[in-house]
């Protein structure tokens, strides 16, 4: 029997006196979910083999055979013809077994100087790095779609809310830009996370390194890593990079969830600020009039799922002594599902943004309720010389009087306004318009249409 593959089938079974039970095989096998790593596993193995040949650890002939075998395996996997075997536990041993069938002893030499511990850590880093790049691109697509929506409605006025109460008038374009800012930070977090992902564990072997004269920097360069992991124990045992990725993903979904909540509220017939295209909605099996915003509702729900995966990974790592433990097999399903959920959500939201129909009249009507320009009246009095706290009190009395009469501030006559402050003059009526209110906030970060358009231009320049 060889160390690589015993007659009992496992790469390690020569040590044991009895076979592993079928129940344990099913319980411990990961192949039916970690086969997703097949391409990056092959990528890592080819880089490792090239280094072994360069260092004269294996022959050039063995290297050529390994390359030939791996090319065939990749073809079989791509064509869906590769036979994944439960008895072989995981993606690594399934590929190694097939390689050995194809090229003989050369395949058995591939694992020289490495362990599955550093092999899988490398695979996961390659996978996460690729998915980060994908997600950053999808965040760009979503931001561009939101910028288009913001540009179309740079002048469309709706009420801004605090505590779900009407606060001040804003523009819909400004509101969309808030989400553009959030998703921009999400992209930055992903890109920053990538720096810590992009370090090579391969060469750490099981936990202590290897006795072979390997060249880790060569492998790192081949695979596009910025550096190698500088401690072999740390390289194989920690999954903090995956946790960090999932934390950044959870924040993406949190921002998606906040946006979803608003879309659901805005689409409600009681509010009626927007409509969402039929292709993103469903109906009811009993109520024929219903049009349900299922996509934002489901995204809101899936956020809890992604948050749960983050907690699962944190809990997975918290009690493990160094170095590698079988616990870490449980890192993949939460990680994979996080990737799938975030990728699918970002794709559909970028598409859905093009299917949002804004209803400016409904938004404007809502902004005319709730005394949204009260702060503008207070600011007006301050500019006339009244201390802000006194201005605040005077306007509060005016609002109270309007509430009692069921009218808006702009419905008061000049004489009625002057009862609250003699500083009020005829120019107040221009201040109390919705357009005047938003136009007055003409500074960087403000809701004035001019600033909204400038912010859109800045974001477009960054995304170009």
Curated annotation (Swiss-Prot):
Location, primary (coarse class): cytoplasm
CDD domains assigned: Argininosuccinate_lyase
Biological process according to GO: arginine biosynthetic process via ornithine; L-arginine biosynthetic process
Molecular function in Gene Ontology: argininosuccinate lyase activity
UniProt GO cellular component terms: cytosol
Catalytic activity: 2-(N(omega)-L-arginino)succinate = fumarate + L-arginine
EC nos: 4.3.2.1
InterPro entries referenced in this protein's UniProt entry, alphabetically: Arg_succ_lyase_C, Argininosuccinate_lyase, Fumarase/histidase_N, Fumarate_lyase_CS, Fumarate_lyase_fam, Fumarate_lyase_N, L-Aspartase-like
Signal peptide interval: none
Pathway as given in its UniProt record: Amino-acid biosynthesis; L-arginine biosynthesis; L-arginine from L-ornithine and carbamoyl phosphate: step 3/3
The protein's name: Argininosuccinate lyase
């Amino acid at each position: 029997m060889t160390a690589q593959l015993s007659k009992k089938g496992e790469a390690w079974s020569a040590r044991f006196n009895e076979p592993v039970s079928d129940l344990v095989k099913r319980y411990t096998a990961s192949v039916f979910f970690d086969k997703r790593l097949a391409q990056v596993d092959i990528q890592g193995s080819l880089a490792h083999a090239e280094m072994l040949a360069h260092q004269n650890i294996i022959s050039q002939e063995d290297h050529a055979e390994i390359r030939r075998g791996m090319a065939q395996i990749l073809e079989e996997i791509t064509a869906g013809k590769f036979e994944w075997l439960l008895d072989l536990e995981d993606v690594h041993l399934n590929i190694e077994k097939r390689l050995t069938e194809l090229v003989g002893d050369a395949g058995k030499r591939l694992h020289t100087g490495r362990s599955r511990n550093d092999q899988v850590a490398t695979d996961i880093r390659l996978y996460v790095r690729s998915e980060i790049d994908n997600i950053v691109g999808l965040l760009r697509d979503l931001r561009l779609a939101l910028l288009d929506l913001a540009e179309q409605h740079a002048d469309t006025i709706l009420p801004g809310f605090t505590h779900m109460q009407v606060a001040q008038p804003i523009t819909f374009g400004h509101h969309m830009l808030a989400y553009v800012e959030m998703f921009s930070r999400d992209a930055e977090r992903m890109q920053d996370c990538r720096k810590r992902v992009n370090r090579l564990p391969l060469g750490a072997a099981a936990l202590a390194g290897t006795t072979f004269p390997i060249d880790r920097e060569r492998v790192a360069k081949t695979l596009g890593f910025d550096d190698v992991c500088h401690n072999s124990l740390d390289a194989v045992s920690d999954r903090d990079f995956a946790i960090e990725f999932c934390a950044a993903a959870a924040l993406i979904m949190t921002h998606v969830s906040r946006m979803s909540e608003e879309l659901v509220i805005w689409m409600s017939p009681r509010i009626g600020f927007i409509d969402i295209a039929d292709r993103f909605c469903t109906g009811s099996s009993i109520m024929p009039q219903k049009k349900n915003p299922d996509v934002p509702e489901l995204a809101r729900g899936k956020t809890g799922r992604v948050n749960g995966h983050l907690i699962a990974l944190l809990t997975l790592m918290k009690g493990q002594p160094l170095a590698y433990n079988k616990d870490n097999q449980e890192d993949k399903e939460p990680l994979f599902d996080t990737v799938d959920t975030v990728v699918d959500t970002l794709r559909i939201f970028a598409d859905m943004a093009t299917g949002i129909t804004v209803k400016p009249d409904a938004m404007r009507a809502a902004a005319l309720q709730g005394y949204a320009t009260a702060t503008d009246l207070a600011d007006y009095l301050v500019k006339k010389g009244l201390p802000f706290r006194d201005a605040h009190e005077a306007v509060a009395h005016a609002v109270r009087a309007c509430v009692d009469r069921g009218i808006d501030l702009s419905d008061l006559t000049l004489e009625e306004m002057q009862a609250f402050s003699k500083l009020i003059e005829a120019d107040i009526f221009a201040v109390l318009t919705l357009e005047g209110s938003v136009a007055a906030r003409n500074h960087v970060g403000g809701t004035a249409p001019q600033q909204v358009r400038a912010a859109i231009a800045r974001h477009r320049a960054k995304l170009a």
